Amino acid sequence: MNNLPRNSQFDSSSIINDLPLDLLDEILFRLEPKSMAMMRCTNNSIKSYLSDPRFGPEYPSWVRPSLFNLGSYGATYVCCHPLVSSCDYMSPGNGVELFDGSADCYIFGSCSGLLLLYIGCLFVANPLTKRFRILDHSGSKLIPMIVNGGLKGLSGISYPGGNVACTERAMCVGFAVNRNLTTKRFKIVGILEMENVYGFEINEGDSWRLSETSITTSSKSDLTTRMKPVYLDNTLHWLRNDGSIMSFNPETEQACLIPSIFHREPDTKLLFAESVKINRLTLISGTIETISVYTLVENHKWTLTRRIKNISIEEETLVYWNIAMYDGKCLVVRVKKMGLEPLASVLHVYDMEANSWGVLVSTLAWPNCVRDFYKLTPSLFFVEEDEQQKVLVASNDRRISYINSIMGLIDTTK
């Protein structure tokens, strides 16, 4: 029976305001991402409360991350899989096909729930809130060269090898979202490499500029090709072939060389990553028998912290395998065996706490077999836009439909 007076109105805002903050936090954090996004749009009290910057770094710990999967040399098909420790069945995940050959997709980074990607133009997008921002990339020295071919270094000399060599340098682009600022600013950093000299270009959302910072190293070692940078402690880190690391803080614009050394064995797969559980840089080195986890200790030494028995791989039936993703909680490897469908491979996931392997998903495997994987943990970070600097694109532009399709790939219902 309704005990409210006949003329009274139900005020959900007042009830929300009367809740203890710790209880309200728990209620909101346990909502599905899609439900939280809807509440933000329909309830002013919730919208105001969620504007608190702590919802940026804390909220992702309650929601399921996804794994984007696409070709490294410009993709016309993009896949996305829920990232879980194990599955009872294999599924192809979600995918979107980009039919326009001029709109190949490149993902340059994933950070704090935002994606930096190129589909005919440069986007920063939040797949959870379905908000995106278009950036003018024409002022960059790196990005136009990567997506169009003809990448040049500081010396102005083009890299040999055509478009493949250019797209392999996509790892020179770093994407950083500062979680500690109320404005939640993002920055794009390109590292410019020439011999043992490094420079940096920066975009803060509206324009590109060359940082006054440059660094000259005493040792000559190239950046590791196709090895994505790692953003940790507000600093971007790029791995070099000798195991040392070039670091750059986008806020202070300070750069340094971390003189760590790693002797890579022949025929090993390598992945540079972050362990979110211990907040450390990690190197994953694997053979078909064993996968080893190394942690950077005291900023100068790679120390073996764990060995994992690889999934059963018979060399006679193996077409290829590689390490796709690691975050300290799980490890993902991709395997293509003979006998599978011509365009099929399998992603296997190792639960670091349960010490067990499971099958994550069956996925497409293009003949060149070179794929990029990006973990995205949904968040409510804003994608702010300066109206004066806004890049205008027609609402019926095909690139807009593509970015909307890609943002729609993440599963926010499970």
From Swiss-Prot:
Q: Name one Pfam family in it.
A: F-box
Q: Which residues form the F-box domain?
A: 13-65
Q: Where are the Kelch repeats?
A: 281-328, 331-378
- Pathway entry: Protein modification; protein ubiquitination
Is Ion transport among this UniProt entry's keywords? Answer: no
Question: Superkingdom, according to UniProt?
Answer: Eukaryota
Q: Which UniProt keywords apply?
A: Kelch repeat, Repeat, Ubl conjugation pathway
Query: Known SUPFAM superfamilies for this protein?
Result: F-box domain
Its GO biological process terms?
protein ubiquitination
Q: What does this protein do?
A: Probable component of an E3 ubiquitin ligase complex.
Q: How does it assemble?
A: Interacts with DEK3.
The protein's name: Putative F-box/kelch-repeat protein At1g20940
Task: State the species of origin.
Answer: Arabidopsis thaliana
